[in-house]
Curated annotation (Swiss-Prot):
Origin superkingdom: Bacteria
Protein name: Small ribosomal subunit protein uS3
Role this protein plays: Binds the lower part of the 30S subunit head. Binds mRNA in the 70S ribosome, positioning it for translation.
InterPro entries: KH_dom (IPR004087), KH_dom-like_a/b (IPR015946), KH_dom_type_2 (IPR004044), KH_sf_prok-type (IPR009019), Ribosomal_S3_C_sf (IPR036419), Ribosomal_uS3_bac-typ (IPR005704), Ribosomal_uS3_C (IPR001351), Ribosomal_uS3_CS (IPR018280)
UniProt entry keywords in alphabetical sequence: Ribonucleoprotein, Ribosomal protein, RNA-binding, rRNA-binding
Keyword tRNA processing attributed: no
Any GO BP: translation
Gene transcribed to yield this protein: rpsC
Species of the source: Fusobacterium nucleatum subsp. nucleatum (strain ATCC 25586 / DSM 15643 / BCRC 10681 / CIP 101130 / JCM 8532 / KCTC 2640 / LMG 13131 / VPI 4355)
Length: 219
């Protein structure tokens, strides 16, 4: 029986790059890894409202960390005259005890980002909008983007308060999960309702890419 895997991890080194870019010996590896997790959790928890899709981390030296934030609302993170981003940098330096540089990259196509689409569906469901309506509207908006070739959405849980949990999905366009050169964006989100938690999964196909055009440059 086939096993389902995260399409992003399956394509690492082929069409996608790693979100953490650094090298370390055995003694420092665990320390750096946990530090990366702390940084990402801190940013996503405190700046969730800014529509954060991804946080990439680079280490130029043992005492310097570069944090790249991909967000749909860059202005909220930067703030007036850079006040917010300066405050964020100070908090991260206190958290890590190292010199931190924060770089913000705004996502231009919000409907082409799987994380933002999944979180949008979850937010609508939590506002008591019917899950089918939220799902079909998200698919319709995404397919209007010229960068999106196909999208698949699956929602699982006690749909409409049913006693038995089930899954429903919808797909439009082409989503070739078995093609490794296919640029597949994938995300998972959770909607908390009065009947329990609903899981939302989103796959977005951006077309086939060559290894020389890997996402994010070098891994």
């Amino acid at each position: 029986m086939g096993q389902k895997v995260d399409p992003r991890g399956l394509r690492l080194g082929i069409t996608r790059a790693w979100d953490s870019n650094w090298y370390a010996d055995k003694k420092e590896y665990v320390k750096y890894f946990h530090e990366d997790v702390q940084i990402k959790e801190f940013i996503k928890k405190n700046y969730f409202h800014t529509g954060i899709s991804k946080v990439r981390i680079e280490r130029t030296s043992p005492s310097q960390v570069v944090v790249h934030i991909h967000t749909g609302k860059a202005g909220l993170i930067i703030g007036r005259k850079g006040a917010e981003i300066d405050a964020l940098r100070a908090k991260l330096e206190k958290l890590t005890g190292k010199k931190v540089t924060v770089k913000v990259q705004e996502i231009k196509d919000l409907n082409g980002d799987a994380v933002l689409v999944a979180e949008s569906i979850a937010a609508q469901i939590e506002k008591r909008i019917a899950y089918k309506k939220a799902m079909t509207q998200a698919i319709s908006r995404s397919m209007k983007s010229p960068e999106v070739k196909g999208i698949k959405v699956m929602i699982s849980g006690r749909l409409n308060g049913a006693e038995i949990a089930r899954s429903e999905w919808a797909v439009e366009g082409k989503v070739p999960l078995h093609t490794l050169r296919a640029d597949i964006d994938y995300a998972v989100a959770t909607a908390h309702t009065t009947y329990g938690a609903l899981g939302i999964k989103v796959w977005i196909f951006h077309g086939e890419v060559l290894p020389s055009k890997k996402e994010g440059g070098e891994a």
